[in-house]
Amino acid sequence: PSLVGSEMCIRDSHATALEQKGDGYVVASLGEESGYVPYTAFSAKKSYLEAHPDTVQAFVNALQRGMEKVSQSTPEEIAKMIALQFPETDEAVLTAIVRRYVEQDTWKTDLIFSEDAFVLLQDILEEGGELTNRVAYEELVNTEFAKKALER
């Protein structure tokens, strides 16, 4: 964590734990302020997509079903589903984090990586000094499988 005066920038689990103990409170969320930025992305070579479209589609369909399950569940249910991934985080803290994410509309309900989100991601990477040359959306992003997953 970074401490600046009486403010600090820390992970949600730590911020929520402090908040629940009455030792602090969350005043802003980077996720809420930034807009939709993909936290996780999957990549494959074009040759793999062409050689194994059924495998790729099955994988994307499973991810889409997971996103639908999350969007149809309560924060308490989601916290129980993901608890094994966060063994160091108390279930009440995890539920509070999930509730905040739900209230902020942090999670999309589909896997389509929009051009706006792609531009925003490149803006962030460029401002952070991690990107020197931008790439065209059409050159790097394939939404074909995500769109088909929504049709099933």
Where are these predicted regions, by residue range?
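Single conserved hydrophobic/aromatic residue that forms the stacking wall/gate
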Residues: 1-5, 9-10
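Extracytoplasmic
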Residues: 13, 37-39, 77
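Solvent-exposed loop/turn segments at secondary-structure junctions
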Residues: 14-17, 32-35, 48-49
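N-terminal secretory/targeting leader peptides
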Residues: 22-25, 41, 87
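Conserved C-terminal helix/tail region of periplasmic/extracytoplasmic solute-binding proteins
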Residues: 119-152
